[in-house]
Swiss-Prot record:
Family: Belongs to the fatty acid desaturase type 1 family.
Name of the protein: Acyl-lipid (9-3)-desaturase
Domain notes: The histidine box domains may contain the active site and/or be involved in metal ion binding.
Bilayer-crossing regions: 112-132, 137-157, 172-192, 212-232, 254-274, 286-306
Broad class of where this protein is predominantly found: endoplasmic reticulum
Cellular component GO terms, alphabetical: endoplasmic reticulum membrane
Lineage: superkingdom: Eukaryota
Length: 448
């Protein structure tokens, strides 16, 4: 029997397959049709839609275990990429993935989850004890702060469970994600994964990364003044007079907004779970959110008066707002771009759009892995306890290829973020017409 003749497709021809119902990707030079798979893709539809029509080997390697490769054959179109090539950066990146796998750095680290759960149990017990068995206002305030710390730590577990297997059993891993996010925090793990996977794929794309799309309250670039389109939310991000007013003073309102940011996450979670959007384990997630909506208000109701109840809730939200600040520090002051994420410069875009936070090892528990955000973006399935180990390898690779490896102290990162917000705020004040008088009496009397 004669050998089968290979069929080829060029990169330009591949680009034409980037529309709903016609989604092709290339992995190691082989073209795959994922049009029908998009609705069942565990990582959601957005990554496939965003990278369709491109060579995406590096992104595939970053997000999928080795066991996934055997599933690709059923999507193979029979076409090979005629002009397929691998950059030196990608070659070295893939070598690192292979070496780290050989070193066992991707292996499950259940002890980290267990230690975090023990810490969460302690925080929960202390907060509940302070509410139920103590009478002082300051104790109740402290109990609210402890609840905020609990939400931060449960967020790290949800983050870990959403990225990789924190335990050996897949069903238990899903339960851990729902328990940490939905039951303890009231946040849908399904919504978080949908949002967070998009952020990883389109790191710092103003049109595709939802973690930069906070109009009307915050913008990190004057490019938003042109009313860009969010391909994540599938709507126009209109920069109107109200947006301009808020943005003009965003460097003053940044921290208060971060303290209240969790309220938006509650709303987004409910929208996700109560609409027709495809959600795995919808019933389990709704049950988890119901559990939270019972125990937290019940605990708050045990406080002696409405003043202390409001104080407790504000303290909880404000403390967990530190986590929202941490998310922002990693990207707000970094390089941004307009347009689709590219599959052929995966390593470069992840390093260019990300900032590490330098901290001593004994503070790793506080940052939950975000202090090594560059490493996390490049190797998202790696347990966070190993990110410090691989940092020297990443630094060396960045130096070899003259790529940025940006890092700053926690205080410096805050300063950089506020500077970015202030620069954009000042630009917003200057464009075209003055701010509407009925919105900005205070603005007319405020400077800086």
């Amino acid at each position: 029997m004669a050998a089968q003749i290979k069929k080829y497709i060029t990169s330009d021809e591949l680009k034409n397959h980037d529309k709903p119902g016609d989604l092709w990707i290339s992995i190691q030079g082989k073209a795959y049709d994922v049009s029908d798979w998009v609705k069942d893709h565990p990582g959601g539809s957005f990554p496939l839609k965003s990278l369709a029509g491109q060579e995406v080997t590096d992104a595939f390697v970053a997000f999928h275990p080795a066991s996934t490769w055997k599933n690709l054959d059923k999507f193979f179109t029979g076409y090979y990429l005629k002009d397929y090539s691998v950059s030196e950066v990608s070659k070295d990146y893939r070598k690192l993935v292979f070496e780290f796998s050989k070193m066992g750095l991707y292996d499950k680290k259940g002890h980290i989850m267990f230690a975090t759960l023990c810490f969460i149990a302690m925080l929960f017990a202390m907060s509940v004890y302070g509410v139920l068995f103590c009478e002082g206002v300051l104790v109740h305030l402290f109990s609210g702060c402890l609840m905020g710390f609990l939400w931060i730590q449960s967020g790290w577990i949800g983050h870990d469970a959403g990225h990789y297997m924190v335990v050996s059993d897949s069903r238990l891993n899903k339960f851990m994600g729902i328990f940490a996010a939905n039951c303890l925090s009231g946040i849908s793990i399904g919504w978080w994964k949908w949002n967070h996977n998009a952020h990883h794929i389109a790191c710092n794309s103003l049109e595709y990364d939802p973690d930069l799309q906070y109009i009307p309250f915050l913008v990190v670039s004057s490019k938003f003044f042109g009313s860009l389109t969010s391909h994540f939310y599938e709507k126009r991000l209109t920069f109107d007079s109200l947006s301009r007013f808020f943005v003009s003073y965003q460097h003053w309102t940044f921290y208060p907004i971060m303290c209240a940011a969790r309220l938006n996450m509650y709303v987004q979670s409910l929208i996700m779970l109560l609409t027709k959007r495809n959600v795995s384990y919808r019933a389990h997630e709704l049950l988890g959110c119901l559990v939270f909506s019972i125990w937290y208000p019940l605990l708050v109701s045990c406080l002696p008066n409405w003043g202390e109840r409001i104080m407790f809730v504000i303290a909880s939200l404000s403390v967990t707002g530190m986590q929202q600040v941490q998310f922002s520090l990693n990207h707000f002051s970094s390089s941004v771009y307009v347009g689709k994420p590219k599959g052929n410069n995966w390593f470069e875009k992840q390093t260019d759009g990300t900032l590490d936070i330098s901290c001593p090892p004994w503070m790793d528990w506080f940052h939950g892995g975000l202090q090594f955000q560059i490493e996390h973006h490049l190797f998202p399935k790696m347990p966070r306890c190993n990110l410090r180990k691989i940092s020297p390898y990443v630094i060396e690779l960045c130096k070899k290829h003259n790529l940025p490896y940006n890092y700053a102290s926690f205080s410096k990162a805050n300063e950089m973020t506020l500077r970015t917000l202030r620069n954009t705020a000042l630009q917003a004040r200057d464009i075209t017409k003055p701010l509407p008088k009925n919105l900005v009496w205070e603005a007319l009397h405020t400077h800086g």
